Regions:
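Membrane-helix interface "capping/anchor" motifs
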Residues: 53, 111-117, 146-160
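Helix-coil boundary and interhelical linker segments in multi-pass alpha-helical membrane proteins
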Residues: 1-15, 77-99, 130-137, 171-183
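Cytosolic, membrane-interface loops and tails of multi-pass inner-membrane proteins
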Residues: 30-61, 200-217
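Oxyanion-binding and handling regions
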Residues: 171-217
């Protein structure tokens, strides 16, 4: 009987893991821009994320993209573990939010719907982490905002946040084990790596600054 129960738990976790990836893989920026007749992959930076939608389509749709991409991380990390436990009719491992949130981020970064060419994972990561590591995420958001307002480079602000969140994680959570700090470190490294093109543009002086108000033609 215990073997059957373990099998059911494994199947439930696997099923919700697949759903987390598929939800994360929904290319909100691509779909929103497509509805306006724009292929977001062929304008601006070519990225499907919120910043490129903000710059290349409209401010409002860029903000909408950010909100939807954040939800792609929050729903698997916060809601899926509860539903998985309900389906399995037993308590499940405490690391499930990390697993489901990580799979959603992987889906956004490597979406099956767009031949595995996705975004940089900043908004989806923020959504996933707000419930998993709220204090560290809050520190990261503060660092991101101050950097963005100060120097107006979205890429630099995202990289600063990608460093700040793991650093805060080691400070705040290491007493409870290394799993969460290590996961935050891996996620931060992924986000920085996904910004390698931005880093090259920063080095050669061609990176665009973020404009809070779109310039009038």
């Amino acid at each position: 009987m215990n073997g059957v129960c373990n099998c059911n738990v494994t199947l439930v976790i696997a099923a919700f893991g697949v759903l987390a990836y598929l939800l994360g893989a929904i290319p909100n920026g691509f779909l929103i821009a497509k509805a306006k007749g724009i292929d977001i992959r062929k304008v601006g930076s070519g990225n499907i994320g919120a910043t490129n939608v903000y710059r290349s389509v409209s401010k409002a749709l860029g903000i909408l993209t950010f909100a939807l991409d954040s939800l792609k991380g929050a729903i698997p990390a916060l809601w899926f573990p509860v539903q998985a436990a309900h389906c399995a009719q037993t308590s499940l491992p405490a690391w499930l939010p990390l697993l489901f949130g990580g799979l959603a981020i992987a889906g956004h970064t490597w979406p099956v719907y767009l031949k595995f060419k996705g975004g940089k994972g900043v908004a989806t990561s923020a959504g996933a982490l707000i419930g998993i590591a709220p204090a560290a995420t809050g520190i990261g958001v503060l660092c991101w905002f101050v950097t963005l307002v100060t120097i107006r480079y979205m890429s630099v602000a995202s990289i600063v946040a990608a460093v700040a969140v793991p650093a805060a994680g080691w400070w705040l959570y290491r007493a409870n084990g290394l799993a969460l700090p290590l996961a935050l470190t891996a996620l931060g490294a992924l986000i920085i790596w996904r910004h390698k093109g931005n880093i090259q543009r920063l080095m050669n002086g061609s990176e665009s600054r973020f404009e809070f108000k779109k310039k009038k033609p």
